[in-house]
């Protein structure tokens, strides 16, 4: 649960002890990045997982009721795609469920496709649109089904089985697939227009 609460805290500027006017800490060695004037927290997209991990280790590492390393390993699993394989089965399950909750929570939002404009400009600020193949907000919607089926679906199936047990969980599944269906069918007014 704590990893759920902390996995995106790395977007917030000033949360790490050494964040200052010279920049924001982005790794355990104390490396920093200086953001351009006027940047939003979205500019930390490429560093937010590392920053979240550093925050968890620093703030929870001395509190006995928390296993800060376990929380940090679960947060690592929210990096998309996962870059470091979990070291044990328990972390694999916890981390994969956290990753699935993160993905389903975003992609199952009934307004997700309408948010493509804002998401595009967040990606633009972070400098990742080109590498993702996005030239406009409409590309996020056009490429969404391929992204979902190839990159997301294989990583959320266990969570979908759990969600299918409750009515509210089934609603999240329906929302998730509705967004994919609408993007596949090019339903107008679902997001950025061509």
Feature map (PLM): residue ranges:
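Active-site alpha-helix of zinc metalloproteases
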Residues: 2-3
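Divalent metal-dependent phosphate-bond-processing catalytic cores, especially two-metal-ion Mg2+/Mn2+ enzymes
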Residues: 6, 10-17, 61-65, 76-194
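Post-HEXXH active-site segment of zinc metalloproteases
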Residues: 15-38
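Short, solvent-exposed segments of well-ordered alpha helices
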Residues: 39-43, 88-91
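Histidine- and acidic-residue-rich, metal-dependent catalytic cores
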Residues: 41-83
């Amino acid at each position: 649960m704590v990893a759920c609460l902390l996995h995106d805290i790395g977007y917030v500027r000033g949360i790490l002890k050494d964040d200052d006017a010279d920049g924001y800490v982005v790794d355990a060695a104390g490396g920093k990045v200086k953001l351009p004037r006027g940047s939003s927290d979205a500019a930390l997209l490429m560093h937010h997982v590392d920053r979240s991990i550093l925050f968890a280790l620093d703030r929870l590492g001395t509190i006995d009721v928390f296993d800060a390393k376990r929380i940090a390993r679960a947060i690592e699993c929210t990096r998309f795609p996962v870059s470091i394989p979990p070291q044990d089965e328990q972390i694999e399950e916890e981390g994969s469920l956290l990753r699935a909750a993160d993905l389903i929570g975003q992609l199952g939002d009934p307004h997700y496709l309408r948010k493509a404009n804002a998401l595009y400009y967040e990606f633009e600020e972070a400098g990742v649109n080109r590498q993702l193949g996005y030239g406009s907000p409409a590309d996020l919607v056009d490429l969404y089904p391929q992204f979902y089926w190839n990159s997301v679906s294989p990583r959320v199936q266990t969570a979908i089985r759990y969600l299918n047990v409750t009515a509210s969980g089934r609603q999240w599944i329906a929302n998730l697939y509705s967004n994919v269906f609408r993007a596949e069918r090019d339903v107008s007014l679902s997001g950025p227009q061509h």
